[in-house]
């Protein structure tokens, strides 16, 4: 629509069959074709466009950009050479070092022996993945050599042409997403999103908030500064997304994507900025200054994006979250406070937060911390009855939080799954790590799904509910347009 407003005809190529019913009036002409080099070039040969935009189709069009340009297609916006610099592992690492910024230590491996050697250098835990993935497919977090061997031999096919990437996993880090638009001179920060789940959960599966709810203003300013450095260095024209991780006040860049990300619609709704439209105009030569968009808009209200999962339809799928994306949709909650926005997003996703009853808690060792103590005290004060497995129960009791101990399944009856089946549990908080522990606790999460019991597989998500209890049963409904009248 942006290019149509500027006096150009717009042509869309979409491989989704649903495009015939959803996008038929969005462009002047719509092609329902596979996104392959041959099919796209056939359309280009017929239409002879003045410009080809590859930023709005996710990862697939980016991979075609260089071949299309080599074949004579007039790519507008960020050029293929810049796309390669962001996508290529070694080129990106060199750029990070040149800018004197931080990145999780990483190596590549083309066989099992090389992976074991490089893992020692990178240090466990590791995020392991094939070199080219969509939606985090075949990505895992491994904690030792045995798990790495299993991954290398069973999960992926490795070769010189298809190496496996080994990244040091930043445990207990806060992940941050930024969407921005650049015209090559000025950069508009669309929105900085703080994730609720820790780094290591796929960004599509993590809830996130605009504005940030816990990061200091100083950290946010530094993240934005680094974002602008990457954007300038890459020569971005149009949209760009970057993901960062913050641990102990140190900022690590995870990746930079010179394209529209899945968060653009959320950011646009939360801020009132039509980022896709602004970026399209930038790519056809209308600067940010000419459009009147130079300053970041920080809303005076909170918006929380929440994922929607299909686990009730697939009870054999483990609902524990990790690097591989499992959500199939998303919702948005808006409120004057983070707590109000968060509980609205939970309700919209079909998650009921109980206000009393029995809560089962079993957490991994790194989660036995101040957040768990605060959460336990809060639940106890709210008249919840806490039940926990031995290690978690000992930790809570040592910190003067009353709880009842119950067996894990492998410890024999009476155990937690029996209690869940009896419909005597209202809330489950179950975090775990390591292949064996995840497999042993699967029955807890599976039974929670079958029984329709609210559960959290990350301490951070459970902790976020603390600020929401004031709004239980007291949800106000407001039009999004009323929040964004100033941003039009």
Question: Which ranges hold each PLM region?
Answer:
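ATP-dependent carboxylate activation and anion-phosphoryl transfer catalytic cores
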Residues: 1-51, 59-62, 74-77, 84, ...
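ATP-binding N-terminal substructure of ATP-dependent carboxylate-amine bond-forming enzymes
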Residues: 1-101, 110-117, 336-485
């Amino acid at each position: 629509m942006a290019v149509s407003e500027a006096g150009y005809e717009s042509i869309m190529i979409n491989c989704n069959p649903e495009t015939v019913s959803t996008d038929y009036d969005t462009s002047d002409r719509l092609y329902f074709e596979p996104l392959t080099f041959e099919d796209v070039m056939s359309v280009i040969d017929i239409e002879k466009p003045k410009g080809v935009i590859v930023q709005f189709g996710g990862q697939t069009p980016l991979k075609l950009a260089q071949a299309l340009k080599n074949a004579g297609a007039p790519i507008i916006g960020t050029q293929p050479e810049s796309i390669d610099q962001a996508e290529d592992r070694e080129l990106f690492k060199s750029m990070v070092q040149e800018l004197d910024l931080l990145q999780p230590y990483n190596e590549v491996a083309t066989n099992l022996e090389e992976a074991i050697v490089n893992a020692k250098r990178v240090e466990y835990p590791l995020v392991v993945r094939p070199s080219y993935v969509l939606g985090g497919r075949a990505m895992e977090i491994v904690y030792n050599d045995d798990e790495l061997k299993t991954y290398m031999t069973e999960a992926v096919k490795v070769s010189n042409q298809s190496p496996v990437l080994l990244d040091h996993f930043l445990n207990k880090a806060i992940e941050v997403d930024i969407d921005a638009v650049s015209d090559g001179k000025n950069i508009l920060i669309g929105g900085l999103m703080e994730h609720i789940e820790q780094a290591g959960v796929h960004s599509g599966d993590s809830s996130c908030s605009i504005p940030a709810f816990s990061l200091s203003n100083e950290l946010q300013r530094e993240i934005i500064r680094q974002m602008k450095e990457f954007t300038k260095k890459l020569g971005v024209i149009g949209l760009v997304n970057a993901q960062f991780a913050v641990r102990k006040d140190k900022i690590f860049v995870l990746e930079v994507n010179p394209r529209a990300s899945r968060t653009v619609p959320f950011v646009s709704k939360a801020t009132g900025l039509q980022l896709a439209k602004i970026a399209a105009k930038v790519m056809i030569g209308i600067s940010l200054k000419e459009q009147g968009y130079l300053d970041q808009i920080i809303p005076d209200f909170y918006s929380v994006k929440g994922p929607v999962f299909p686990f009730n339809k697939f009870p054999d799928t483990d609902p524990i979250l990790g690097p591989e994306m499992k959500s199939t949709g998303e919702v948005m909650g808006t409120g004057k406070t983070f707590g109000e926005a968060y509980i609205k997003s939970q309700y919209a996703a079909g998650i009921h937060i109980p206000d009393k009853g029995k809560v089962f808690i079993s957490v991994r060792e790194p989660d036995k911390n101040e957040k768990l103590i605060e959460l336990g005290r809060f639940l106890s004060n709210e008249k919840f009855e806490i039940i926990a497995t031995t290690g978690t129960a000992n930790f809570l009791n040592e910190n003067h939080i009353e709880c009842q101990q119950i067996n894990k399944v492998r410890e024999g009856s009476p155990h937690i799954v029996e209690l869940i089946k009896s419909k005597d549990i209202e809330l489950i908080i179950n975090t775990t790590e390591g292949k064996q522990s995840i497999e042993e606790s699967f029955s807890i999460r599976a039974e929670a799904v079958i029984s329709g019991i609210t559960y959290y597989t990350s301490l951070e998500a459970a902790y976020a509910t603390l600020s929401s209890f004031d709004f239980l049963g007291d949800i106000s409904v407001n039009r999004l347009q009323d929040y964004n009248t100033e941003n039009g």
